[in-house]
């Protein structure tokens, strides 16, 4: 493994870790970064899923005590059972639609115009949602993640389905959707983190089974480097985001999305971006 390949794996891991939990679309960033780094071989998709796994491990580590408490409390504690049920309910819609339309989504939406459009539209939705939040006089209805109802979870799960469109952002869809449905900003952010766990674990398992040939002796080292880079950067990002949402809104991410969407459109049609 040469040092250039090592640098590419580390850069992509950091990009994934920094963008997976921000409402900016990690998919769009990985496509652009992978193209500029000329990292678009046959197993690039598997590498992307592996580094996503590294990012979700960071969430598991950050919330390890709560996760252990939920798992051990499942047989007897109603709060643990209710929380688990909410995560399951919120996860089902995206998994069902993803399995049904995976091939069509890849065939139709993985090109510069749809991704750029999703980035810009997602940014506009965030601006609109934040304007609504500022106009509200009453506090958010759901002030604690334990106060979520199954109906709240279903609504957030339906919002997560928009993330099947490349460029829309899973975290953006769930956080902004949650806020629009009455969740406090921090509650929506934390619930989005927990929803990522089954989604990304499932995607990792699915891609591993589908492309097991990619896991060779030569590639394992590269995958491990990317995973570690994603873990570290995601851990830093998650902690930073939790502090950020306590005192800021998501307007800055909205304008960034719009600018990045226009950039994707520019590089896509200029020939600078090898869209794979």
Curated annotation (Swiss-Prot):
InterPro entries: UppP. The keyword Lyase does not apply. GO terms for biological process: cell wall organization; peptidoglycan biosynthetic process; regulation of cell shape; response to antibiotic. Pfam families: BacA (PF02673). Catalyzes the dephosphorylation of undecaprenyl diphosphate (UPP). Confers resistance to bacitracin. It catalyses: di-trans,octa-cis-undecaprenyl diphosphate + H2O = di-trans,octa-cis-undecaprenyl phosphate + phosphate + H(+). This is Undecaprenyl-diphosphatase 1. Its EC number is 3.6.1.27. Signal peptide: none annotated. Belongs to the UppP family. One of its GO terms (cellular component) is plasma membrane. It is a multi-pass membrane protein. It comes from the Bacteria. It is found in: Cell inner membrane. One of its GO terms (molecular function) is undecaprenyl-diphosphatase activity. The gene is uppP1. The keyword Cell membrane applies. The chain crosses the membrane at residues 4-24, 45-62, 83-103, 108-128, 187-207, 217-237, 252-272. Keywords: Antibiotic resistance, Cell inner membrane, Cell membrane, Cell shape, Cell wall biogenesis/degradation, Hydrolase, Membrane, Peptidoglycan synthesis, Transmembrane, Transmembrane helix. Bacitracin is thought to be involved in the inhibition of peptidoglycan synthesis by sequestering undecaprenyl diphosphate, thereby reducing the pool of lipid carrier available.
